[in-house]
Amino acid sequence: MYVELKHINKHFGNFKASDDVTVGIEKGKLIGLLGPSGSGKTTILRMIAGLENPDSGEIIIDGKVINDVPASKRGIGFVFQSYALFRYMTVFDNVAFGLKIAKKPANEIKERVHELLELVGLSGLEKRYPSELSGGQRQRVAFARALAPNPQLLLLDEPFAAIDAKVRQELRSWLKGMIQKLGVTSIFVTHDQDEAIEVADEIIITNRGRIEQVGTPYEVYSNPTTAFTASFFGQPSIFKDYSKFRRFDILENAENAIVRPEFVKVTKKTEVQKYKNSAEEGVVEEVDFRGYGIELRVRVNGVLLTARRSFDQPRIEVGEKVDVFIYRMFVTQGDTATLLENKSLREPVVVI
């Protein structure tokens, strides 16, 4: 592993921000640190950067323990959420700042700055000041400045949080492509699930100072190993007694059932339902327009479920009785999560 954290603990007063954190990151990977507020993800990033010191444990980069190495000597580029650009410096001088501190030759600085501005798509803006740039352009300057000294590791603290939605979407794709091109090992902090899934090669899920799960976006989303990870993604409906729903195995010591919108199919009484005999009757309580389609809130057996339908399907109204089929659900037992499939999926289909 290129970056390793071994049994890291960190307290802020009585608050335990990192609780025996142990994780490894391969060289060249783009890693997303994902979790709710207060889960410890930013603390991990700041300890790797040298901006905070762990109470115990080891931080290792490229085989070397760096706990006692000052932040300025770690060879790490850091992109702050607020950009942290120098207001009274031009774009050129902002990008060149670290190189000047390192006393690099003027011709080398000029060449490197122009190379990076071309890389981030800001050629020709060298003489502008941060106040003359858009939010997306400022963030690109911050990326270029962090990359200027050729860091061995790039850290990004919620890099898209201060940017509007459209530009944020564009920058996600741009960042992923840029880091793949450069091959620099990178770690970014986010609380945005979609952002982590879209950008990261691997995701580290944090919760209450601990690592919940590590895996590819597909693995952590589709195969959660803990109750927290199963409930964290999407807009799940969480309820206690799932035995009221048909055709699911009953697990001993089951605690909660977790049903995501994509696990639910809602059809009008007049529509074809592949699993009609296994469907439950529900009553629609909410119908909301979303950019991707229609979102429904349907009460079934006393449980309020969220489901989605496309625009080209027949319209469903509030108060309408509908057929609801649950394909699958996660069931938690203690801290583990098990995926259960509706038994009807394994049986011959009768279309009614």
Residues of each region from the PLM?
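ABC ATPase nucleotide-binding domains
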Residues: 30, 71-77, 81-225
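The feature captures the beta-strand-to-loop junction immediately N-terminal to the Walker
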Residues: 34-36
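ABC ATPase nucleotide-binding domain helices that frame the ATP-binding cleft
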Residues: 42-45, 141
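Helix-to-loop junction immediately C-terminal to a conserved catalytic motif
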Residues: 49
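Conserved ABC transporter NBD signature motif
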Residues: 57-65
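Glycine/charge-rich catalytic "coupling/switch" loops of P-loop NTPases
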Residues: 237-287, 311-352
